Amino acid sequence: MNFVDMLMYYAQSNPEKQAIILPDRIVSFGMIGTGIRSVEVAIAEASLDPSHVVAVRIENRTRHLIVVSALYRLGIVSVSVSGSEDLSKAGVKVDAIISDRNQPFPDYGRLVLLQDDWFARSFDAAAVRPAGFRDQDALARIIMSSGTTAAPKAIGMSARVVEDRIVTGRRTLTLAPWDRMMCLPVLTSSYGFGSALQALAYGHSAVFAESAIDALQMIALYGVDLLVANPQHLHFMVAEHNKTPIPTPTLKLIKVSGNAMPPSLVPEVRARLCKDILVGYSSTESGPVAFGHIDRIVEQPGSTGFLAPWVDAEIIGPDDRPVPPSIEGRLRVRTKWQGYDLTEGADAAKRWMYPGDIGSISVNGMLTLVGRVADAINMGDTFISPEQMERELSGYPGLIDAAVVGMPQASGQQEIWIGVMAQGQVNEQAIKDFLLAKNPRWKVSRVKVLDRIRRNDMGKIVRARIREKLLAP
């Protein structure tokens, strides 16, 4: 049994139940089931079979989910893409791309153009269920990592991992009863794709919005009780709510992951949207690692929640040996349902995974992150965490957003430069003095106003782009 079998079950047992709710339409489970069977016929006619790896680039979320589900049911490996990823560098050889755009996609194999009639093909309702993947440990799905500090990695997942991720993800959502999940992360991300399946595979509704105002209106209109988002989504929703205060009384829980939640944002979200916030930490390779209610986290900067019982985690020092509780070092994790970097091979799923974070684990299992190893700023006699400085700037008067980066110098060391989005004039010296008062090591060389702080789909700052903006005339 797999998640598509559950979708097909609900298509039969509760066909009128709302499966997907969009700003302009509602799709029932019955329609999802019919769509999957129809698309299976179209996929076979396109001469795609389990020997192929297929990229999926479809903007319409409903169609995207249906096509991926049909491929999965047929035992065909898929990877969701935006169309700009360099898959070959990540170790992925794609045989074809199913796209709703009639344009060339270099290195993506042959183009299979998605047509409207894919969803209206005749099929044999009595046909035997497809055999699917050859076994539960075979490669079934590829997810691209965020690539915030390096090139995106292609993470391979077996059918067993895909199914178990859905189950473990559900276990993080037990703080409140819910039936309608609004899922804001994109489906090309592990967070977005997994969250949508955690709703649909259990017979719940997945609600998708195109903007912050859409999200607020749809929560109110459809009685959404669970919101899945990253901090950037919540930032825009709070800003929109400030202009258009749409009540959201049905919201019972907000799950936030993908990036650290700025301390100044917490009271705004709790006052305007929902008081109960579940904070989570995960990675594309490992899945959920830690989670906890905001009340246990908000007073501990950098805390991400308590380690999940299905996770082995250690903090290691420079000698790669575990350090005592509450001592900072590099994080490594290992889970039963771990994906693997395709360039390393399937055996990598059995080894420790190093997500690139610096942090500590308390005696009671609270995971606290200081920052990213790759983002640490080399000041010569010490390393500075840009994330800690950004947390201090959260809520600074007049600042909308801020990004701290290390700017390389001829000496081999780095200077601290800051890009900010602001309302009104910015007093550069005041910001420098504010940070220096917080920490005498935080000696900022430059503060520059930017029109945008570039973030990826998970809300994480793309620091390479920030450096380019700061160096631009």
Question: At which residue positions do the language-model features occur?
Answer:
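Gly/Ser/Thr-rich phosphate-binding loop
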Residues: 225-228, 240-300, 312
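Conserved AMP-binding A3 loop
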Residues: 28-30, 140-167
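Conserved AMP-binding/adenylation subdomain of ANL enzymes
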Residues: 163-180, 188-226, 240
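Conserved beta-loop-beta connector loops within the AMP-binding
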Residues: 300, 314-333, 360-364, 424-428, ...
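Conserved AMP-binding/adenylate-forming core of the ANL superfamily
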Residues: 8, 16-47, 52-61, 69, ...
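AMP-binding/adenylate-forming catalytic core of the ANL superfamily
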Residues: 227, 358-443, 454, 459, ...
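Conserved pre-ATP/AMP-binding loop-to-beta segment of ANL
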Residues: 15, 123-144, 150-151, 174-180
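Conserved ATP/PPi-binding loop(s) of AMP-dependent carboxylate-activating enzymes
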Residues: 306-310, 321-351, 366, 382-384
